[in-house]
């Protein structure tokens, strides 16, 4: 058995064992005491479960997408040293065009507007 097959087998086995353990370990029926918020032993003054802003979530997702884009384009200056630099530049241009179209779509749909 070669090294890659051994590593893949160990990874799959470990993942299955951890998924099974995480499925069976939590309590099946938590009581009201565990579901209540804890504020230093005092009764909560207000609702501890505040609604999460969906706008903030969308902007955070957009930030992650463009951060990933920058990470993908960082090795681009070394791409011109390959045998076929035209293909590398073509793919990077396609990625930039796709993300630019996505940004334009989000902008036209109002996804970047913080206040309505």
From Swiss-Prot:
What family classification does the UniProt entry report for this protein? Answer: Belongs to the complex I subunit 3 family.
Q: Per its UniProt record, what PANTHER family does this chain match?
A: NADH-UBIQUINONE OXIDOREDUCTASE CHAIN 3
Catalytic activity reported: a ubiquinone + NADH + 5 H(+)(in) = a ubiquinol + NAD(+) + 4 H(+)(out)
Where found?
Mitochondrion membrane
Enzyme Commission number: 7.1.1.2
Q: What Gene3D superfamilies does the database record attribute to this sequence?
A: NADH:ubiquinone/plastoquinone oxidoreductase, chain 3
**Which UniProt keywords are present, listed alphabetically?**
Electron transport, Membrane, Mitochondrion, NAD, Respiratory chain, Translocase, Transmembrane, Transmembrane helix, Transport, Ubiquinone
| Cited function | Core subunit of the mitochondrial membrane respiratory chain NADH dehydrogenase (Complex I) that is believed to belong to the minimal assembly required for catalysis. Complex I functions in the transfer of electrons from NADH to the respiratory chain. The immediate electron acceptor for the enzyme is believed to be ubiquinone.
Task: Extract the GO molecular function terms from the UniProt entry.
Answer: NADH dehydrogenase (ubiquinone) activity
Q: Name one GO cellular component term.
A: mitochondrial membrane
- Specify the superkingdom: Eukaryota
Its recorded name reads: NADH-ubiquinone oxidoreductase chain 3
Membrane topology value: Multi-pass membrane protein
Q: Which organism is it from?
A: Oncorhynchus nerka
Q: Which residues cross the membrane?
A: 3-23, 56-76, 84-104
